[in-house]
């Protein structure tokens, strides 16, 4: 091919078409990058939330600081999945480090902050599409029953065969009241705790992961790991408790996706929490 010798002609012949192609590539990269950044931030926040309960205090503070940095970046870049998720996590971790130890209270305030953000901030409105009842047909009901029975049996087996030492748990959470009142309180706790944990992990976490990564297994696994990690000091606790809670989180995530809403996983979760309340009130209390 014969190239033009005059510089101006050469510019028009070669450089200008090339610059237009570069401009197109840059535009395409900018169009794609916000979603990619959103996914990276969501995964980063989730991984730090998984690590924070499992490591020493100094490392947990570092993980929390990392979440704050990612939250600032998510808000600066207006990431629709990472921004509300990071706010929820920052609120929960702030309460935890400030001395609040009761998990449902932490989750409740975190969810209130999340709800306020997605309602007030204009570019986040109508992003919390997970907050719906969903289906509860025969197949979903069967899944709930199977998941509830399996998880309840797993928790009971954990208590009966591993003989965990949980007097501190009973002393901290079970007041000195008549058994009848404790049973009523246990049922109320089971419903509230199930609703809060499902809203947090199958709602806030799974929704952010699904919308940024896509509704595949990685999103399902990450939310289950985050759910399992917070049970390191819960009931069931320790690493066996983390494993059981992680498997349970996978079950609940599948049910939430199949049902397309929150009612079904909440019902299945209540079954398991009723078993936990029964163990604490009827088997683990020193008075019994």
Please give the residue ranges for each predicted region.
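Acidic (Asp/Glu-rich) catalytic motifs at the cytosolic membrane interface
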Residues: 193-202
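Juxtamembrane helix-loop-helix connectors linking adjacent transmembrane helices
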Residues: 106, 115, 120-193, 211, ...
């Amino acid at each position: 091919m014969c190239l033009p010798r005059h510089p101006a002609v050469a510019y028009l012949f070669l450089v200008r078409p090339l610059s237009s192609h570069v401009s197109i590539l840059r535009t395409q990269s900018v169009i794609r990058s916000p979603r990619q950044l959103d996914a990276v931030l969501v995964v980063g926040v989730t991984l730090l939330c998984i690590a924070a309960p499992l490591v020493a205090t100094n490392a947990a503070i570092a993980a929390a600081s990392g979440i704050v940095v990612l939250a600032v970046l998510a808000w600066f870049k207006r990431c629709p999945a990472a921004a509300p998720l990071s706010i929820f996590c920052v609120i929960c971790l702030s309460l935890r480090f400030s001395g609040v130890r009761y998990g449902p209270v932490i989750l409740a305030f975190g969810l209130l902050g999340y709800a306020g953000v997605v309602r007030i901030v204009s570019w986040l409105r109508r992003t919390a599409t997970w907050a719906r009842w969903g289906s509860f047909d025969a197949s979903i009901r069967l899944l709930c029953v199977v998941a509830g029975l399996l998880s309840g049996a797993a928790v009971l087996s954990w208590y009966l065969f591993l003989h965990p030492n949980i007097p501190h748990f009973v002393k901290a959470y079970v007041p000195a009241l008549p058994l009848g009142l404790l049973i009523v309180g246990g049922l109320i706790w089971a419903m509230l705790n199930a609703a809060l944990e499902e809203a947090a992990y199958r709602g806030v976490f799974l929704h952010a992961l699904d919308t940024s990564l896509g509704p595949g297994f990685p999103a399902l696994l990450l939310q289950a790991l985050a759910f399992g990690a917070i049970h390191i000091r819960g009931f069931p606790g320790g690493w066996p408790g983390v494993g059981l809670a992680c498997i349970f989180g996978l079950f609940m995530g599948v049910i939430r996706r199949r049902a397309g809403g929150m009612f079904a996983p909440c019902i299945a979760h209540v079954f398991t929490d009723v078993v936990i309340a029964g163990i604490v009130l009827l088997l683990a209390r020193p008075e019994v």
